[in-house]
Amino acid sequence: MNIESRASFAVRGLQVLLSLIAVFHLVAGAGLMFSITFQRFAVAGYGAELDWTARNIYFLRIVGSFAFVLGTIAAMAARNPLEYSIVPIGFIEFFLLRNIHRHLYSQELYEGFGVSSLTNDLTTVFFGVQAIALAGFLWAAHRK
């Protein structure tokens, strides 16, 4: 595979990955904003325990708004990821920071939300793979 076809493959990889990130964040964001049932599903899927107070429900709605905006940004960048390369860079940074926090403050995560160390490690791998894939595709796409 020559450099140009590798770059084209990498751009397509960025488009697919950003589209998947967009769909996830749009669906999760809308669900967290508008459905307590979805909130319960998401919290359980994350392996967390939460007191279902008005404060926590409202906080999850705010998290949903943030996720929805990230989904919109990812969807827009998926159309032309090289023109909007700041978006995959932002997601790389976001995923890395989440992984750092996940371990730097793991005791808070374990005690405050009842998340297991296995779930924490699996989540770290999930977001780490995405960060590496975005970085690899972005690097290869710029090597024309």
Question: Where do the PLM segments sit?
Answer:
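Membrane-helix interface segments
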Residues: 82-86, 114
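Non-cytosolic membrane-interface motifs at loop->transmembrane helix junctions
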Residues: 47, 111-124
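Core segments of alpha-helical transmembrane spans in multipass integral membrane proteins
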Residues: 27, 54-76, 90-93, 97
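Hydrophobic transmembrane helix segments
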Residues: 21-59, 64
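Cytosolic juxtamembrane helix and N-cap/initiation of the first transmembrane helix
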Residues: 1-25
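Alpha-helical transmembrane segments of polytopic membrane proteins
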Residues: 58-64, 119-128
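Hydrophobic alpha-helical membrane segments
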Residues: 88-105, 124-130
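Membrane-water interface at the C-terminal end of transmembrane alpha helices
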Residues: 125-144
